[in-house]
Amino acid sequence: MPRNLIVITGSSGVGKSTLARALQEALLPDQWLHFSVDSIFYCLPLSIVERVDQQNDHAIVDSKAIVAAAFACATTLLELGHKIIFDLVILSETGAQGLMRALGDFDPLLVELTCSWNEIRERTLARGDRTLAEAEHGYRLAGGHLQPHCAFDSTGTSAVDIAAQLVARLHSGTRAA
């Protein structure tokens, strides 16, 4: 059965979404949808999104419901035959277990993306869509909760180069890092 799910994990600012977009292009003519927890989060009213992102105020949203909705949407898309590149931050063992409960039956290729703190700091400041405190929180807690098939450090490697390596692994059937 051909693989139809790639899951990219890592802290905020490591380049998960950038890698997902590069993979979409590299995997053409196959059409892969990029989906994430943020796909649901950014459906919220702008004032709530800005409060969460700029003030680091997560108390105003039901994060568990947003994650569950993202998993449910991804599951539906996969069941309908779509190919998905799903990216998310996993901060705990519980989060990793939730991901695998929701999407594990689809035999995902698990990709872990890391990056140096200095690079994440620069990227976060350049983006301006979240606080450094949130980025640092993710940097400290993300990673190590899943055993990835492939792991990459995006500090000095472009998303296009990482995507090319992943595509080569997908085409060769190689799963191990």
State the predicted function of each range.
Residues 14:
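ATP-binding Walker
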Residues 123-177:
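Small-molecule kinase domains that catalyze NTP-dependent phosphoryl transfer to phosphate-bearing small molecules
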Residues 8:
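Hydrophobic anchor at the beta1->P-loop junction of P-loop NTPases
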Residues 11:
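P-loop (Walker A) phosphate-binding loop of NTP-binding proteins
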Residues 61-107:
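Glycine-rich phosphate-binding loop used to anchor ATP phosphates in small-molecule kinases
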Residues 21-71:
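Conserved substrate/cofactor phosphate-moiety recognition/catalytic segment
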Residues 17:
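Walker A/P-loop
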Residues 104-123, 152:
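Conserved phosphate-donor/acceptor-positioning beta-strand/loop module used by diverse small-molecule
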